[in-house]
Amino acid sequence: MHKIPKGTALAFDFGEARIGVAQGDAELGLSHPLATVTGGSNDEKFAAIAKLVQEWQPRYFVVGLPVHADGTEHEMTHLSRKFGRRLNGRFNLPVYWVDERLSSVCAESLLSEAQVLGKKRKSVLDQVAAQAILHGFLEGGPAECFNGREG
């Protein structure tokens, strides 16, 4: 269990094509889906993220780390870590990485219960996965912090 930072957080479900974003606050005990970032280049994606950072003024980021069922890392794990390091480098905010193994399953379940179907489901799936990642973090699940220094 980790100490939950105070203030607003932005959480990310990173993918090469789409990045789901959620916003939340531990003190309020709330989190909600926010946006799905798409775009061709990393610069376009980070420009969209910069607008969200400006609007929500987060104190930290939470990034989901995809791993195999046995906990071992793979290519997307490394890309997610790289994304988190870029967030830290661009915005100078700490990044907490959390295991996202069940976030997509949780998101699918929530959307099924809410009867969100078709194109609408696809458009919000990554956002709801980011919300699940953030919810797990705010509930005190395991996390690893990166603040610009390896080690």
Swiss-Prot record:
Under the heading Gene3D superfamilies, the entry gives:
YqgF/RNase H-like domain
SUPFAM superfamilies in alphabetical order:
Ribonuclease H-like
**Keyword Nuclease belongs to the record:** yes
List the GO cellular component terms: cytosol
Question: What's its top-level EC category?
Answer: hydrolase
Compartment(s) of residence: Cytoplasm
TM region positions:
none
Q: Could you tell me what this protein is called?
A: Putative pre-16S rRNA nuclease
Which organism does this sequence originate in?
Neisseria gonorrhoeae (strain ATCC 700825 / FA 1090)
